[in-house]
């Protein structure tokens, strides 16, 4: 086993050039969401690759029901919601290990990039900071490099390195590259697990960073707010009702609610830390959050706008229910309406998903902790996040013990301009994944 481990690790180190080329291929396929186009194209690339390893490969498009639950019309989604599934069958088929990464990316900002966001450029240095795992392998740039296409590559080459050594497992390995994680994952991993397409005994969620072992994440609910005004000539605005002005009042109230109520609503998770960048700003427990993400309204400066709409993300802590969150959210807006008789509004839930907490004491988690130390030479802390990942579907719906980690840190600038991934981190990630494959599935 030790000899096999060294062969696998050497294979990954020796094939960095191929790893980079494959990630470049994925980065150059535009899968930003919204709208979420080209999922089927990227799934085909994954299918071609995994067919080389003797996997059973399939592409599943989510059904109409899941499209509606995703917020299809509200978010302006387009194209099939394609999901890739590969099965590397073992001798006995037990246990079953499922690993997942997502193929969609955050939207690409129109300005502020110093590199082509779909270019996959490679440099030796990172001006935003170096990865602690940087051994001189360089950085690859583009939207999705670290979130989450680098992880798609890591799980791919972890299997390739084992396949090239002729490895066959006792158990079955299921690998999924799924869509729409950035908007809730309803038509992605949610669809695959809730429809019974993916069932497993253990899970790995490749999403996050290499700063720790992720065991918890918060739930989230996405709201759409609309204000309704009365259009009029902009030179006589007193005769109209300005929908943007009304939305501005709502936003003042929402920000007060976030800072004075939600941020104080914190919950400690025993044995689980928050990422250092949150602790640095005074948040050492998971906290309820709120973000006003988009706002649209008006047609021109000379017309009083009669419509305005915005999307708001409400991050939930364990114990909060969707009904509680919705009722409290609406009560904030009702408080504004009580002071403004002209305020007319609508609130709609785009989609929602619950958070999750894995116990640090679970045997699987303790085994994984040892694998991280074996590969990286040091123990990593158990982390919780104020974000949300598709791991909730594995834990809550699939009933799989699971953990998450991935590629990147603050220097990787996920969701920001100039996103990148450390090539050495992708290799380290792949080593960890390969060892989990070996240890949990067993060598036949």
Regions found by a protein language model. Give the residues of each.
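Short glycine-rich, acidic/polar surface loops and turns
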Residues: 205, 209-212, 292-298, 385-402
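Active-site-adjacent substrate-binding region
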Residues: 251-259, 272-277, 354-402
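Acidic/histidine-rich catalytic neighborhood of metal-dependent amide-processing enzymes
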Residues: 139-216, 273, 279-283, 441-444
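Active-site metal-coordination/substrate-binding segment of hydrolases
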Residues: 68, 80-84, 94-173, 423
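Acidic-enriched catalytic cores of C-N bond-cleaving enzymes acting on peptides and small amides
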Residues: 200, 234-295, 302-304, 318-344
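Zn-dependent metallopeptidase/amidohydrolase metal-coordination segment
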Residues: 11, 371, 375-443
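N-terminal helical capping/dimerization or prosegment-like subdomains
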Residues: 2-110, 307-311, 325-328, 425-428
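Generic non-transmembrane alpha-helical segments
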Residues: 7, 11, 21-25, 29, ...
